[in-house]
Amino acid sequence: MAQTQADTAARKPVGQSVSATRRVSRLRRHARLRKKIAGTPERPRLVVNRSARHIHVQLVNDENGTTVAAASSIEDDVRSLQGDKKARSVRVGQLIAERAKAAGIDSVVFDRGGYTYGGRIAALADAARENGLQF
């Protein structure tokens, strides 16, 4: 019994890769979160962006669409730090807290970017809190 091309196409699994599914899920979580929070000049949004190797954080004023302060694990003083990615995330949290204080900001709205609150995200948030930022 010969298979037709339609039969062969019907048997192929349809779907996305696991990484694509995770990325889409994260973007959906972030969209839900963004509907609820917004940054103001007095209380900007602390946005976290994580990659496999680095972590970036920004203080964003959504009314103007401007970045008030930023910190990243790509910076030289963080790159030279010995330790794992979590230790670098802690240092980035300390840097953003220092830069927020220098800009006159004491309180922020935390935007975890759709990432689960744990690991590097939690380490960054805890370090920022310990250095004086109010969430």
UniProtKB/Swiss-Prot annotation:
One of its GO terms (cellular component) is cytosolic large ribosomal subunit. One of its GO terms (molecular function) is 5S rRNA binding. InterPro entries: Ribosomal_uL18_bac-type, Ribosomal_uL18_bac/euk. GO terms for biological process: translation. Keywords: Ribonucleoprotein, Ribosomal protein, RNA-binding, rRNA-binding. Residues 1-23 are annotated as: Disordered. Signal peptide: none annotated. Belongs to the universal ribosomal protein uL18 family. Part of the 50S ribosomal subunit; part of the 5S rRNA/L5/L18/L25 subcomplex. Contacts the 5S and 23S rRNAs. This is one of the proteins that bind and probably mediate the attachment of the 5S RNA into the large ribosomal subunit, where it forms part of the central protuberance. This is Large ribosomal subunit protein uL18. It comes from Mycolicibacterium paratuberculosis (strain ATCC BAA-968 / K-10) (Mycobacterium paratuberculosis). The lineage of its organism: Bacteria, Bacillati, Actinomycetota, Actinomycetes, Mycobacteriales.
